[in-house]
Design a protein with these regions (language model features):
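N-terminal Rossmann-like FAD-binding beta1-loop-alpha1 element of flavoenzymes
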Residues: 2-27, 333
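Short amphipathic alpha-helical face segments that pack within enzyme cores
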Residues: 15, 70, 327-331
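Dinucleotide-binding Rossmann-like beta1-alpha1 core, especially the glycine-rich loop
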Residues: 47-112, 118
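Short, solvent-exposed loop/turn segments at secondary-structure junctions
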Residues: 10-12, 32-35, 121-125, 184-186, ...
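Active-site/ligand-binding neighborhood in enzyme catalytic cores
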Residues: 87-90, 94-195, 199, 203-206
Length: 346
């Protein structure tokens, strides 16, 4: 049986683990966070469960939403304790709390330019119109009074209960999780695994530093005045008056979210007109593959008898929702199975 090493154990790595556990021997390499950004804040876990009945995220509110029934079922197999939940978000602009994404009510009190452009520049650190145009295209407006953040058929929160612990088959060797430091290309060349699935930052895997990332910092406070009782769970603050970009409130706990250029890489500063061209220039050995019917991709690197797949938000260097990060991984493993016959005994 072939052997697979998965680098990183966020949603893309967990998806690969779930899909491959019956096909190969699977080894996980992760320093400290099983679940990636979808983990609860363990410092406040017991108190939050006791006082609110649920936990809140260590890295803000991360919600799974999709129209794809296969991806929804796969997500539930990874997070069996995930809870069905429809999120609400507001934005504070012109002195008012308004629904977000903008709906009819929002646009009665503020323009799209007042809402989207300043928030995008603040969150991503991009100032020029050329830099943020591709980011603005991701935003949507609703021609109704629906307050929900997402309208997808399947919506879950992964970490509400049971520590948000993802399912990992007992057949998967997890010994490497706490013993490994970060692995890179040189380490991979020396390992004995046939397949390597990388979900860590693409350029840094090859010992380079040509791609931009954004990070976030979080500060937990107490809402002694119960000021957010009737507000949405997440509130966006686009105006420069506020240093933070979002506030997440969970009972009396208030989590302030600040953008940062340093720290744990969380979001690729991806420009579709520039980033892919730069990747092809700096890493010409990579093969590019798009996933059919999905605005996501993966990269393939064949080196000797090994195959390296780069998937997920950081591995494929794309800004992706949870479902699209999973689809990047599903697409890569499907390609490996169908096009390469990789898992057939030879």
């Amino acid at each position: 049986m072939k052997s697979t090493l998965i680098i990183g154990c966020g949603i893309a790595g967990l998806t690969a683990c779930r899909l491959l556990e019956s096909k190969t021997a699977v080894y996980l390499c992760e320093k400290d966070r099983i679940g990636g950004l979808c983990i609860p804040n363990l410092d406040y876990y017991d108190r939050a469960i006791q006082e609110n009945g649920y936990a809140f995220g260590a890295y803000g509110d991360h919600m799974f939403h999709t129209e794809n029934p296969y991806i929804a079922k796969l997500f539930k197999s990874i997070y069996p304790t995930a809870v069905a939940y429809e999120h609400r978000t507001e934005i504070f602009v012109n002195g008012k709390f308004l629904p977000y994404p903008p709906n009819i009510k929002t646009l009665q009190h503020a323009t799209v330019d007042e809402i989207v452009a300043p928030y995008t520049a603040k969150q991503w650190g991009e100032q020029s119109t050329d830099d943020i145009t591709h980011i603005l295209k991701r935003f949507t407006t609703y021609n109704d009074y629906d307050y929900r953040t997402f309208k997808d058929r399947y919506q879950y929160v992964p970490y509400a209960m049971d520590y948000g612990k993802p399912f990992i088959s007992p057949d998967v060797d997890t010994l490497d999780i706490t013993n490994h430091t970060e692995m890179d290309y040189e380490d991979v060349l020396e390992c004995d695994h046939d397949l390597i699935i990388n979900t860590s930052p693409l350029d840094k895997f090859y010992g380079k530093d040509f791609l931009k990332y954004r990070s976030l910092e979080f500060e937990v406070g107490i809402d002694y005045g119960n000021n957010f009782k009737d507000r949405a769970m997440t509130i966006n603050y686009p105006e420069r008056t506020f240093a933070y970009t979002r506030v997440h409130h969970h009972g009396k706990y208030i989590v302030y979210e600040y953008p940062s250029e340093t720290g744990l890489p969380m979001y690729p500063v991806y420009n579709p007109d520039k980033s892919l061209e730069l990747i092809r220039k700096e890493l010409p050995e990579l093969q590019y593959h798009s996933v059919l019917g999905c605005n996501c991709r993966f990269f393939v690197h064949k080196c000797g008898n090994k195959i390296i797949l780069h998937v997920g938000r950081l591995g494929s260097y794309q800004y992706l929702n949870i479902d699209k990060a999973m689809m990047s991984t599903v697409g890569a493993i499907t390609w490996l199975t169908v096009q390469e016959n990789f898992f057939q005994d030879k």
